[in-house]
Amino acid sequence: MPAAEDSADRDLLTHAVREAGAIAEAAFGTKPKTWEKSKGNPVTETDLAVNARLHELLLDARPGYGWLSEESADDPDRLTKARVLVIDPIDGTLAFIKHKPEFTVCAAVTDHGRPVAAAIFNPITDEMFSAARGAGAALNGKPIKVSATSELEGSRMLVAKDVIGHPAWPRQWPPMTVGSRASIAYRMALVACAQFDSMMSLSSKHEWDIVAGDLIVREAGGRVTNHAGKDLVYNQPVPHLRSVICAGPAIHEAILERTRDIKLP
């Protein structure tokens, strides 16, 4: 049955990201070999070690699933699979390099392009966020819900200050508490557990940055869309997403009122 399959996949993901996360935890605070995949896009030997361990743990258990990971060559065979593992071995690599405890190990399963199981693990703070389709979201095994905040003014948003303060906005944003975290998956998870009310990113992202947080926020009662209010679909031939906004339902709509008609470059 799908529900049992989704829950089994969630349990597998939480086990895998915890075990692979131990590799990142052991290397945290050291100086791993580091290079740039592209300008401003660093990767470390630890990213690759975590990726290899996740690949072993997950595909040994689910050999029929597709695979999409930031640190693996993209295999187009994933496009033929109903269920696909989507992985970010270390989301927030720069924070990891700088010894900031704001990185996460992320894994999700999609079914026909929709997330059905997810786990986001911060091995330094020992926060395990998880969800399965229709079964709710949890932080360290305890159910979580998004905040019920409905007003932007006075709310808590994870967003780049230069975005919220950009002069091109037709309307100035009201006073809010603005925060930041290196890992976008971590930002989404913090919305899911109501530490923040919303998260907005208007820069291009990859599927592996977003997909686990998408399910966790939704299962915590929130909404996840692009800036135009459209749901996100995964396992696409080009796994890029133009923008993402997540929040509780009421404040999400208030954000969309400001973003729905903007033109992104």
For the regions a language model picked out, list residue spans one by one:
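N-terminal subdomain of lithium-sensitive/metallo-dependent phosphomonoesterases centered on the IMPase/IPPase/PAP
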Residues: 1-90, 250-251, 257-260, 265
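Residue-level signal for inorganic ion chemistry
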Residues: 24-27, 47, 58, 93, ...
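Short loop/edge segments at beta-strand edges and connector loops
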Residues: 69-71, 141, 182, 228
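Short loop segments at secondary-structure junctions
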Residues: 110-114, 124, 133-136, 142, ...
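Short, solvent-exposed loop/turn motifs
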Residues: 115, 143-145, 231
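An extended, acidic
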Residues: 147-265
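DPxDG-like acidic metal-binding loop motif
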Residues: 78-140
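Generic detector of well-ordered alpha-helical packing
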Residues: 48, 71, 89-92, 123, ...
